[in-house]
């Protein structure tokens, strides 16, 4: 049975990755707005994508609140965001703790992809949060490399999306089918 890709996007990166994944796997990519958990029961593999906002995966409750109903499914979660790859280990631990209160079930695989930030497209709430983050990080006495990078990113557009990043996810799903 074919997998399905579900995504919840705010600025477009997650949708773009979701469509790339669906294209490579020969399946559908569907906006999470139009999906109910009952729709997912027909699939063996569910691939869910959401952007990271303050360490929370956008829309992840579709999966986390229904893990009991999806327990027999292979679940792959992908995130999009601006966290540098050399800081992922620390950040991933925080993301998992914030989104999976009881830990990640064995049948859930998580992948992280670089996203984009176009300052003009941000909502006023996100622009305000970016300014506050920059001010907070810039005021630190001994900022980490990640904090320095985040301060730098606050002033510039950046599109780090890269289709090549999905290759491990594709291999993983194809190996499970």
At which residue positions do the language-model features occur?
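N-terminal beta1-alpha1-beta2 submodule of the flavodoxin-like/Rossmannoid cofactor-binding fold
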Residues: 1-72, 167-177
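FMN-binding flavodoxin-like domain, especially the glycine-rich phosphate-binding loop
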Residues: 24, 55-177
């Amino acid at each position: 049975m074919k997998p399905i890709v579900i995504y919840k996007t705010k600025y477009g990166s997650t949708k773009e990755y979701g469509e790339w994944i669906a294209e490579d796997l020969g399946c559908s990519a569907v906006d999470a707005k139009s999906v109910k958990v009952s729709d997912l029961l027909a699939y063996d593999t569910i691939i869910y994508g959401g952007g990271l906002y303050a360490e929370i995966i956008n829309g992840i409750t579709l999966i986390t609140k229904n893990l009991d109903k999806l327990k027999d499914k292979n679940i792959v979660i992908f995130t999009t965001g601006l966290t540098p790859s050399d800081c992922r280990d620390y950040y991933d631990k925080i993301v998992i703790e914030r989104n999976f209160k009881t830990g990640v079930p064995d049948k859930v695989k998580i992948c992280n992809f670089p996203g984009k930030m176009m300052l003009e497209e941000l909502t006023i709430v996100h622009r305000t949060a970016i300014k506050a983050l920059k001010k907070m990080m810039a005021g630190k006495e001994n900022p980490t490399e990640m904090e320095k990078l985040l301060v730098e990113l606050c002033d510039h557009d950046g599109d780090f999306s890269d289709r090549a990043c999905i290759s491990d996810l594709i291999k993983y799903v194809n190996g499970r089918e």
